């Protein structure tokens, strides 16, 4: 029923009251405009974007599967990143420990080389190779001296046991001759301590006679 029909059936307004009542009747008969409903949210999931031809239930299940796969991938990447960080930290710690051990080892070597240099007479070398060469030569000399002393001990020519010869003077010519005789006796006697005792006794008797 339109506004033209309502105007035909209602009498023409004769006053302001009738005009107002006429307008109220028109407004009461005019259908009230319904408020427009808000548009539905169009939340399209990633599954609906990639699979538009799939039905609603199937789309939801596929979207859940994709979301779960993404979470698993993120967890795997996070775990792998943590493992890489731990390995890197472990390598850094091992490198620092190795450097510290190497530094201590070099310090000990330098200390030992300085101590060895003090034992070698007239050693003025600074590099390690030259210092070791000097140490080898010095040890060879010491070894030769030890062998020489061993041979002298075997022959009874130990300098520690040989009597000291005083300077030749007119007053001690006889004593010098006696000591020479004692030395010849010591060289001719067997290698034992008895000749030394005998020579000492002879020296004592000679001194007594003088």
Swiss-Prot record:
Taxonomic lineage from the root: Eukaryota, Viridiplantae, Streptophyta, Embryophyta, Tracheophyta
InterPro entries from the UniProt entry: bHLH_ALC-like_plant, bHLH_dom, HLH_DNA-bd_sf, PIF1-like_bHLH
Listed GO biological process terms: fruit dehiscence
Subcellular location: Nucleus
PROSITE patterns registered for this protein in UniProt: BHLH
Segments forming domain bHLH: 93-142
Tissue localization of expression: Expressed constitutively in roots, leaves, stems, and flowers. Confined to the valve margins of the silique.
Gene Ontology CC annotation, any one: nucleus
Keywords from the UniProt entry: DNA-binding, Nucleus, Transcription, Transcription regulation
Annotated region (Disordered), positions in chain: 1-49
Gene Ontology molecular-function annotations: DNA binding; DNA-binding transcription factor activity; protein dimerization activity
One Pfam family in the UniProt entry: HLH
Name of this chain's protein: Transcription factor ALC
Chief localisation class: nucleus
């Amino acid at each position: 029923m339109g506004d033209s029909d309502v105007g035909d059936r209602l009498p023409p307004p004769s006053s302001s009251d009738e005009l107002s009542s006429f307008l109220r009747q028109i407004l009461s008969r005019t259908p009230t405009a319904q408020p427009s409903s808000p548009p539905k949210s169009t939340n399209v999931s990633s599954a609906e974007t990639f699979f538009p031809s799939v039905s609603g239930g199937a789309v939801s299940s596929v979207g859940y599967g994709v979301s779960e796969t993404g979470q698993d991938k993120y967890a795997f990447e996070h775990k792998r990143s943590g493992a890489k960080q731990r390995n890197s930290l472990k390598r850094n710690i091992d490198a620092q420990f190795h450097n510290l051990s190497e530094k201590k080892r070099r310090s000990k070597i330098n200390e030992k080389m300085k101590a060895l240099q003090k034992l070698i007479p007239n050693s003025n070398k600074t590099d390690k190779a030259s210092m070791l060469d000097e140490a080898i030569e010095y040890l060879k000399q010491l070894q030769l001296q030890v062998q020489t002393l061993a041979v002298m001990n075997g022959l009874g020519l130990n300098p520690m046991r040989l009597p000291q010869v005083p300077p030749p003077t007119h007053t001690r010519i006889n004593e010098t001759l006696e000591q020479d005789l004692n030395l010849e006796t010591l060289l001719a006697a067997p290698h034992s301590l008895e000749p030394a005792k005998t020579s000492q006794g002879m020296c004592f008797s000679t001194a007594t006679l003088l």
